[in-house]
Amino acid sequence: MSEQLLSELSPVAATSPSPAPAAQQKLNLLDMNRQQLREFFSSMGEKPFRADQVMKWIYHYCCDDFDQMTDINKHLRARLKALAEIRAPEVAEEQRSADGTIKWAIKVGDQQVETVYIPEDDRATLCVSSQVGCALQCTFCSTAQQGFNRNLRVSEIIGQVWRAAKIIGAAKVTGQRPITNVVMMGMGEPLLNLTNVVPAMEIMLDDFGFGLSKRRVTLSTSGVVPALEKLGDMIDVALAISLHAPNDTIRDEIVPINRKYNIETFLSAVRCYLDKSNANKGRVTVEYVMLDHINDGTEHAHQLAACLKYTPCKINLIPWNPFPGAPYGRSSNSRVDRFAKVLMGYEFTTIVRKTRGDDIDAACGQLAGEVIDRTKRTLRKRMNGESIEVKAV
């Protein structure tokens, strides 16, 4: 990571908004949380409760047509159609994994981001992107290799949830579980887009929005400390941290933002967030990708235990998911098991995460959103004699 880029990772940069829409465009109601929607209706001379009615139609019923909102009078519907729209990003491509995971390439302007639906026995998690690309340049992550383009707008973030809910809702007959959890773990660093991420999460939590529990909405960060310090005063959601190293020497190399905000500075900010939060039950989720002979030795496990001694947490060990041109290998099962046993010996709750969707490059660290990656993936599949279901939408 360049010094210039590091200098830009400041509270100002972390909260800078994405470009506003052109003046002639209708207002997209997906860009507004409930308070903003009420202010919009008040500006029209309408009662604030109209905002609640419309919001319920949008998010409870995935409705994007004002004419279908039958408890809104025709005159108001006509005014809404003249002034506003409900426009979620469209799906460009859908891929389905053998394990039930679905990855959507979502069109945002002339670019794409990726959204992943992960069904399990007792839940269904949606992994949502916050930026086109990523500025943090983590060396083990496919998204980082395409660089950073722009922040997503509120409508482009919550629109991923809306679009997925609409698709899954229409497919109930196939037995797919409705979305129960949302994780801000897709493309981008959420804390570098607070201006848009926070209102989107507010809609996820709002009873007139998706009505999710604050413990079921998780924000993951690599350590933009000034923005993390602000987050605790803005919203209370579950927190996960992308640590990935037991010491600053290794983390400086694989997570370059560590050169600006080192591990102790990061963990100190995490503890402050936990002190303010009810959503985390007093502990943070630590994400740790296992890189063969880089950070996966038993000596690293002992160092990690010492590093986290004063930070209440549970630890997710993540098998590294390969992408073309990456300089790493995935840790063997035996090395992961030995690593986990050391941590459990220190009485850390330790989970070895099951890889989901890696056959469609939807697993952790594999999201890229670019056609060039799909070309390389297809070649790799053919060389292995495998097939993949791809559907253009």
Curated annotation (Swiss-Prot):
Enzyme class, UniProt record, top EC level: transferase
SUPFAM superfamilies: Radical SAM enzymes
Record keyword Disulfide bond present: yes
Matching Gene3D superfamilies: 1.10.150.530, Aldolase class I (3.20.20.70)
Protein's cellular compartments: Cytoplasm
Pfam family name, one: Radical_SAM
Entry similarity comment: Belongs to the radical SAM superfamily. RlmN family.
Protein name per UniProt: Dual-specificity RNA methyltransferase RlmN
Originating organism: Sodalis glossinidius (strain morsitans)
Gene: rlmN
